[in-house]
Amino acid sequence: MEEKRPTLCIVAGPNGSGKTSTTMQLLHYEWTENSLYINPDNIAQEQFGDWNSPAAVMKAAELATKMRYECLEKRIDFVFETVFSSDEKLDFVRKAKENNFFVRIFFVCTESPEINVKRITQRYLNGGHEVPISKVVSRYYKSLLNLSLIHISEPTRPY
């Protein structure tokens, strides 16, 4: 009998694209029902008290990274959100594939970084977390580049 492959579901895209809204819908599907959900924004708010504090955000990112690698090691199904603008995330997808994870990538994006900036501003005015405009713009283009690189280099299932 063949061992069940663990599943990694990544919801990726630039800041302010709607990753969390998309993830909330995906978490209702049968194939994610037993998955651990790792979200650095939630970790910053719930465990370190403030998602607008640079120190809390840094601690949350470190904890989320640790949790992701533990899931790989223990072969646990999991879902995580990422801006997908760092090379580390590309390496992580490769490691998951090497560990025989079934990888699904849902890429959420708007048609321009200006739209993302407006969405983030509205989110902040409604009590959410902010992201500096310069980071929104640079991450927007880097995440698109990384999506094209992962699609070319790794047989994944992007949506």
Regions found by a protein language model. Give the residues of each.
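A glycine- and Lys/Arg-enriched "phosphate-lid" helix/loop adjacent to the NTP-binding pocket
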Residues: 101-146
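Conserved lysine of the Walker
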Residues: 19
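Glycine-rich phosphate-binding loop used to anchor ATP phosphates in small-molecule kinases
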Residues: 59-107, 143
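Phosphate-binding P-loop
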Residues: 1-5
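The conserved Walker
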Residues: 14-15
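Conserved substrate/cofactor phosphate-moiety recognition/catalytic segment
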Residues: 24-74
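Single conserved hydrophobic/aromatic residue that forms the stacking wall/gate
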Residues: 150-159
